[in-house]
Structures are given as structure tokens and as C-alpha cells.
Amino acid sequence: MSVDNVLDKLVDEKKYRRRDLRNSLASRIGIEDRPSSTPREPPKKRLRFTNVPLDVSDFTLEDMVKEFAEPIYCNFYDLKDSRTAVFEFEDPSVMERVVEKYNETPLNGGTVTVEIFEQERRPDRRRRTQRDNRRGNGRGSRGSHYKRQDRPAMEDELNAELEDYMKSS
């Protein structure tokens, strides 16, 4: 065999696929079956205002924050007795300046707490492992009738039930 023939033969052969990946549905529909080895994004750093009195408007908080920079994300959460506001900025140094200025600041009769927190990304729903699917993910995969054990009726109970039936007819 010449070198050209060997090279031609090598090029014509298909790449070997692992047996455990051969029959998965993912390869047939064009998605990746295994989690990729790409590094995860670092967690997002956001700014959280807590214990904000209910009578403080969204616009007031936005104006306080816009003194430093325009937020790229903002959201407000109303709780029973206070509010929480979350902001995100392009530049993390802006958040530190906002914390320095507004942390433990009195606002409309309440003391506002400002802190920087890291928000972890939620795992992608499509990337559940098969082991999670076998367990049922706590979603009640089995019906409730599996949980109760029906005890056999005792002889005395059956006799009493039969007597009641016979008396009623």
C-alpha cells in the first residue's frame, strides 16, 4: 500500500462516536446531549435597595440612582410592609458609590439598606440530568394512591357490616 492509499483510506473513514452517545435523541435533532465544557458566565453583580417604605415611588429611587449612571436593569418588588428595588449597571464601581451614599439613609420615615449582591444564573432547564428525571424532580411523579397502604378489613368489621346490610333489607 502506498502512502496515498493509506491517507485516502483514513480520510474516507468516519469519526468513531462513543457508544453511549450513538442512540440519543439529541444527536438526531441537532442539539448537544452533554453539558458543554464552555466556562459559565460570572454571576451578575446587582444593587439591592431593601426596607424601602411603601410610599416611596419607583421614580424617586430611579432618580436617586441616575445621579451616578443610567441603570441597564431595574425591577421593583412590593412586599407586605416594605419594597425592594434591584438595579444593574455597566460599571461595578458605580454600585460602590451608590452604596457609600445611600446605605442606612433615612427615607420617608424608614431606613433604606443598600447592598451589592451576586445573582447566580439559573441552570438551563434543558440541561437536566437523566438521574433528576428518574427521581421525578419532586413534582409528584407517582400518584397519591401509592402512598397509602390499604389495610385488609378485620373479620369483626366485616361481620358488623354484613349484619347492618342484612338488617336494612
From Swiss-Prot:
Its main location: nucleus. Disulfide bonds: none annotated. Residues 45-119 form the RRM domain. It is found in: Nucleus. Keywords: DNA-binding, mRNA transport, Nucleus, RNA-binding, Transport. CDD domains: RRM_YRA2. InterPro entries: FoP_C, Nucleotide-bd_a/b_plait_sf, RBD_domain_sf, RRM_dom, Yra2_RRM. One of its GO terms (cellular component) is nucleus. Associates with mRNPs. Involved in export of poly(A) mRNAs from the nucleus. Recruited to the coding sequences as well as poly-A sites of active genes. Belongs to the YRA1 family. This is RNA annealing protein YRA2.
